[in-house]
Amino acid sequence: GIRDSSVTGVQTCALPISDLTARQLQKLMCEKLGLDFASSVVNKTGGGSSLSYVYLNQHPGDAHYIALSLQPMITGPMMIAGQIPHTEMTPLAHLFNEYVGFAVRADSGIKSGRDFVERLRKDPGAVSISLSTALAGSNHLATVLALKTAGVDIKKLRVVVVAGANESIAGVMGGHVDVMVTSAASQIAHIQGGKLRGIAVSGPRRLSGAFADVPTWKEQGYDSIYANWRGVVGPKGMSAAQIAYWDDVFSRLTQTPEWRNEALRLLQDPVYMNSAETRRFLDAQQQELRAVLVELGLAK
């Protein structure tokens, strides 16, 4: 059984937050839940996390293999033939949400999220938007879903895709682009330092700390919420007993103060869902995101 065996956790992409999450899960399982199995974290990077799911499904029905799940698990198969859809894996948990921040240079003439939207409603190409790391990635989706809700023609946006948050920050600070869209956490130091000014956040409520004064889209009149979520999946073919085992593990792990405090420190929203709830969530994500990607011509 799992209790007296070894577990392999697959880290899905070369992002610091993913590696931190995988290793924190490993640490808490051993130290706080007292689970008596050996565990290891294996990095299977590349292909928008698709390689990790190929590796995972080489072990069908084996509950000793689990992987972090991210939004590209949903959008990747819509855009790239041959990627494994989420329906071919076993959803095990939704762990937390990470919200997206919209920011401008401190002296920008764009004063608010509403100001940003109104400029784009008049002319969708009037404002340059820097986002990482790819079209159909979380920052792009947070942008187009909010602007679509606001009545902007999202097919005509002037989007600049860069390699990472640091490049977005440099572009805005240097005056090369008008608005940057990245994880809220990556903007904190520059907002605190007075170099950037937040104009909107994609969450259901305001964030803490440096983002306490940054309103949500909903506060500014646009009914849009977007989360860059993290979860856990297992391979296809897991049994009800195996799923129940991991439901118990993750429900207990996500209630520990260590898990919740670390999430809040990183501006993450520790929203836990069990296997059945996660499956319904992923199905709903697939429908919502397919519609906007088809509109953009990025999926069929």
Where are these regions (language model features)?
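Stable alpha-helical elements in mature extracytoplasmic
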Residues: I17-T21, L25, G48-S52, Q71, ...
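Short, well-ordered junction/capping motifs at the entry into regular secondary structure
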Residues: G1-S5
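C-terminal lobe and pocket-closing loops
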Residues: S186-Q255, A284-Q287
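An extracytoplasmic/periplasmic, membrane-proximal ligand-sensing/linker region
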Residues: A240-K300
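N-terminal (or domain-start) structured segment
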Residues: S6-E88, A126, L135, V152-D178, ...
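Short coil/turn segments
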Residues: A14-P16, Q71, R105-I110, S132-G137, ...
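A ligand-binding cleft/hinge motif common to bilobed small-molecule-binding domains
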Residues: L68-A81, V144-G151, D178-A212
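Hinge/capping helix and adjacent helix->loop/strand transition within the periplasmic-binding protein
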Residues: L28-D36, Y55-H64, P77-E167, W217, ...
